[in-house]
């Protein structure tokens, strides 16, 4: 998916495969949830002032990746309401987190937080370092990104049973707009 901000900043995030070196379980029904389901995530980011970086890292479990689409859809829908509360989603690996804050009706500030192996190369890397990439986006653009992300995730079905229902921990919602 690609999300572009009004100020020229952008982020592209997509799954590019299962974590290398981890074979699928012989019996998916008996395997512990998650271990074989790490996805290699490719990130390409650009700040508003033109600094760029990219990386590949096994950052999300399949179920987390699928749940992200529902979360993004939910944020787009909430932005249509009068005063949606700020929201955040974190994952098992601390490389990525996302926050939203309503700016005005149907406009959001989406903060993509990078940490650990996902930090930009120009940052020092103490264990607690976080780099926030702020993106100002419309609810419609966030819906498009959620649909793109869901499409990317279809190529990577779970290889073990999930802790969540098929559509993830959040109910699938209709498109905003």
Regions of interest found by a model, annotated:
Residues 54-58, 82-85, 128-131, 135:
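Alpha-helical rod/repeat scaffolding segments in eukaryotic adaptors/tethers
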Residues 4-6, 14-16, 44-48, 63, ...:
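A structural detector for beta-sheet-dominated domains
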Residues 1-54, 173-177:
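N-terminal domain-start interaction segment
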Residues 113-177:
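Mixed-charge, glycine-accented linear interaction segment located at domain edges/termini
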Residues 74-98, 155-177:
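Short glycine-rich, low-complexity/disordered patches
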Residues 19, 49-51, 104, 118-120, ...:
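Residues that cap or initiate secondary-structure elements
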Residues 37-80:
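Short, well-structured hydrophobic secondary-structure segments
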Residues 24-25, 33-39, 88-124:
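Intrinsic, low-complexity N-terminal interaction/targeting segments
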